[in-house]
């Protein structure tokens, strides 16, 4: 094979790889602990500064109005510099927060994963139309039950294995935010 043909094939493969991320890459970069609750054992709790605390099963979330957003997930600490691109499908976070009835003194939304990881968004940001609680990527079920999808924000805001949403009246800082990472996490 000529050097030119080799370079063309290599370039074509690289472009194909970067154009659409498969669920396999997401699986490799997000190990799911086997002992974490799944199925009927699992529920998403929404509480704190809300009028109507919620305890939602996976099935209840699946029958809520769904939306799909195209977004790119950029992990800050991924050694492979992988970018997960695609169509994320789920429920608008704002829909769930409205159902819970956010109290006026709430300033932050705290997200907790099943393994204790945390992140946060301001209440205003959390109500954006494009922020969803995703259960599918490119029409395939996510392996980690639910993931917060936050377009335009670094991956540490995209909490996977989401289990608890709490509204608080103080400036909470999540796992990485409390270590000096930007609380806004905007991708330039």
PLM feature spans:
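N-terminal intrinsically disordered, low-complexity segments enriched in P/E/S/T
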Residues: 2-188
């Amino acid at each position: 094979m000529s050097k030119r043909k080799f370079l063309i094939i290599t370039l074509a493969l690289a472009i194909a790889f970067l154009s659409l991320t498969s669920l396999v890459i997401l699986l490799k970069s997000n190990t799911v602990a086997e002992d974490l609750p799944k199925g009927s054992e699992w529920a998403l709790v929404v509480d704190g500064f809300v009028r109507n605390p919620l305890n939602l099963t996976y099935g209840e979330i699946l029958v809520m109005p769904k939306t799909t957003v195209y977004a790119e997930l950029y992990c800050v600490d991924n050694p492979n510099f992988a970018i997960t691109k695609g169509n994320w499908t789920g429920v608008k976070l704002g829909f769930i927060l409205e159902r819970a009835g956010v109290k006026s003194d709430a300033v932050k939304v705290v997200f907790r994963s099943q393994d204790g990881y945390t992140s946060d968004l301001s209440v205003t940001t959390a109500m954006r139309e494009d922020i969803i609680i995703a259960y599918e990527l490119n029409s395939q079920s996510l392996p980690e039950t639910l993931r917060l999808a936050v377009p335009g924000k670094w991956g540490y805001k995209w909490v996977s294995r989401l289990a608890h949403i709490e509204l608080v009246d103080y400036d909470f800082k999540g796992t990485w935010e409390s270590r000096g990472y930007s609380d806004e996490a905007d991708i330039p």
